[in-house]
Amino acid sequence: ADLGHPYDPYEGIPLETGYITTSSPPIVVNDTIVVGNSAEQGYLQARVENVPGDILAYDKTTGALKWKFNVIPQPGEYGHETWENDAWEWTGDVSSWAPLSADPENNLVYIPTNSATIDYYGGFRPGDNLYGAALIALDTRTGERKWHFQMVKHEIWNFDNPTAPVLLDLDMPGRGKVPAIAQITKQAWVYAFDRITGEP
């Protein structure tokens, strides 16, 4: 493709976020590319500060940033109050290192997240620490949160979500065919939801 200028691998990348990477491929949903970022793993750290692995979406044709979803809610955002002691300002590591899944027909992308810093201790970050160890459904067009479920509140056992959620249709007694999503966890449990509404 002719970009009209020399290729710059850092163009459009918010470098102020610090040390961040990705361990799984992005997912393309209709005209949007969604990237699940991950930060340095908390259990390898000697510090409590870290960068959140916010979810980024780009236009698949132009490469322009479409939206960003804060995995650690900022002031005024849903779930901000779950980060007590102002821990939202300096802790991080909530990200999606596992692959994402999507329902293109309904313009939804599903984000399985990991724990907040540090994996095995959270005394400095009281509260439920949303969206750590959660499954989040986002509108691929806007980045709006449609629903979420937090598997482990205030996660300190490294029980994050290690796999892409599985989309399937279930025949449920009394409900008929239900568009479902199943998330495998390190708890040895599988959580299943209506993938449109988030109802368990």
Predicted regions mapped to residue ranges:
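Noncatalytic, solvent-exposed loop/strand surfaces
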Residues: A1-P200
